[in-house]
């Protein structure tokens, strides 16, 4: 249900963000801060009424504005907990996009920082695969395709390229049809042969 999905979202974002951070060559301290930021990026949603914790296409502007306050709430809670400035910055920018279409500050590419760019991309990807109520979930392959084909201007090209290489053409969890017409679920990516997952 929705509660389980909301509980798993920070874990999903943390695991995938750490894998992406490593593939981008982030150092140990950066990975530590990224791990913390990924786990707490949505903690401010606890201050919202339950019906506003997930964005839906049917939200009216006033509800959308209230939903967007979860970013400031998350930063305030993280600050009170004494987290590092790098963590606070990543949490503050986890909905910012390279093309300026994000929120709350409508920042653009160079202003975002690598950690925030990773968090924004992985957050978007996980929400596409594990969406809020009333929204159809995409398979990992479909989510990657949509991000690359329709949303790539929102993300840093280096971060997005590394993400696609890391996830592979057929990301884990994708259902594929084999040459013998049987179906299989991809268990892992073969980075040296992306068209031949395991």
What does each model-identified segment do?
Residues 1-198:
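Histidine- and acidic-residue-rich, metal-dependent catalytic cores
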């Amino acid at each position: 249900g929705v509660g389980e999905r909301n509980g798993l979202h920070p874990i999903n974002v943390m695991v995938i963000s750490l894998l992406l951070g490593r593939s981008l060559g982030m150092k140990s301290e950066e990975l530590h801060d990224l791990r913390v930021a990924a786990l707490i990026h949505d903690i401010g949603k606890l201050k919202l009424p339950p019906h506003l914790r997930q964005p839906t296409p049917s939200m009216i502007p006033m509800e959308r504005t209230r939903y967007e306050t979860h970013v400031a709430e998350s930063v305030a809670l993280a600050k009170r907990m004494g987290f590092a400035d790098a963590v606070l910055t990543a949490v503050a920018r986890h909905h910012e996009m390279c093309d300026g279409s994000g929120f709350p500050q409508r920042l653009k590419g160079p202003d975002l920082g690598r950690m925030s760019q990773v968090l924004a991309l992985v957050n978007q990807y996980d929400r596409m695969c594990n969406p809020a109520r009333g929204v159809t979930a995409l398979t990992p392959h479909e989510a990657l395709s949509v991000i690359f084909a329709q949303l790539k201007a929102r993300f840093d090209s280096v971060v997005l390229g590394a993400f696609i290489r890391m996830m592979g053409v057929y990301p884990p969890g994708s259902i594929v049809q084999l040459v013998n017409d049987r179906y299989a679920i991809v268990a892992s990516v073969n980075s040296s042969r992306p068209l031949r997952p395991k």
